Amino acid sequence: MKKNIHPNYGKARVSCVCGETFETGSTKKELRVEICSKCHPFYTGSQRMIETGGRAERFRKKYGLAK
């Protein structure tokens, strides 16, 4: 392998919007995620829907247009 072309790989702190934090390996120091294993419906057993909303949904909501 060539030297000095690979990014530095080290510990990274991952924080979720639910408040959960944990450490993993990454080329970045800090990662922020919307869903983790503590709040994902598959792992929790709940069937709640999480709306993240994209540009199209915000446009439809703003102008009162149907899907």
Curated annotation (Swiss-Prot):
It comes from the Bacteria. InterPro entries: Ribosomal_bL28/bL31-like_sf (IPR034704), Ribosomal_bL31 (IPR002150), Ribosomal_bL31_A (IPR027491), Ribosomal_bL31_sf (IPR042105). Coiled coil: none annotated. Keywords: Metal-binding, Ribonucleoprotein, Ribosomal protein, RNA-binding, rRNA-binding, Zinc. Its cofactor is Zn(2+). GO terms for cellular component: ribonucleoprotein complex; ribosome. Zn(2+) binds at residues 16, 18, 36, 39. One of its GO terms (molecular function) is structural constituent of ribosome. Binds 1 zinc ion per subunit. Gene3D superfamilies: Ribosomal protein L31 (4.10.830.30). Belongs to the bacterial ribosomal protein bL31 family. Type A subfamily. Part of the 50S ribosomal subunit. Binds the 23S rRNA. This is Large ribosomal subunit protein bL31.
